[in-house]
UniProtKB/Swiss-Prot annotation:
Its main location: cytoplasm. The keyword Oxidoreductase does not apply. There are 2 genes for uS17 in S.pombe. CDD domains: Ribosomal_uS17. GO terms for cellular component: cytosol; cytosolic small ribosomal subunit; nucleus. The gene is rps1101. This is Small ribosomal subunit protein uS17A.
Length: 152
């Protein structure tokens, strides 16, 4: 994935807005929160060093609205993934269902290591960019092996 391990990779100095940093205070102070709704804060968010203002665990974003699940299709963007949500649509004329899908862009925190094929749970938040309105809350790693039964 395209997430960096270096904290200071931007032009401006990256710091958490909640923590006052000076020479007298020891390093290692970190602010994090519980997003609620039964989702655990990952250990990387608690003990990590990254700074991400759009992260639901250490940033200024609150999760409200819909909670969705989908499969990761693309991880090519910086801190953003594309997930695919498949569903069945009923056709009354033929009394049958057809498979359809929607692609959804979601912000991924550096606390997660995501690869294509992983199943992620995302929560709705305020608009983070033109297309991104969701944030990754949980990741279930994709297991390799024989072809497995999916949702549909």
């Amino acid at each position: 994935m395209a997430t960096e391990l270096v904290v200071q990779s931007e032009r401006a100095f990256q710091k958490q807005p909640h923590i006052f940093q000076n020479a007298k205070k020891g390093a290692g102070r970190r602010w994090y929160k519980d997003v609620g709704l039964g989702f655990k804060t990952p250990a990387e968010a608690i003990y990590g060093e990254y700074v991400d203002k759009k992260c639901p665990f250490v940033g200024q974003v609150s999760i409200r609205g819909r909670i969705l699940t989908g499969t990761v299709v693309s991880t090519k963007m910086h801190r953003t993934i594309i997930i695919r949500r498949e569903y069945l649509h009923f056709i009354p004329k033929y009394n049958r269902y057809e498979k359809r899908h929607k692609n959804l862009a979601a912000h991924v925190s550096p606390a997660f290591r995501i690869n294509e094929g992983d199943v992620v749970t995302v929560g709705q938040c305020r608009p983070l960019s033109k297309t991104v309105r969701f944030n990754v809350l949980r990741v279930v790693k994709h297991t390799e092996g024989p072809k497995q039964f999916g949702k549909f």
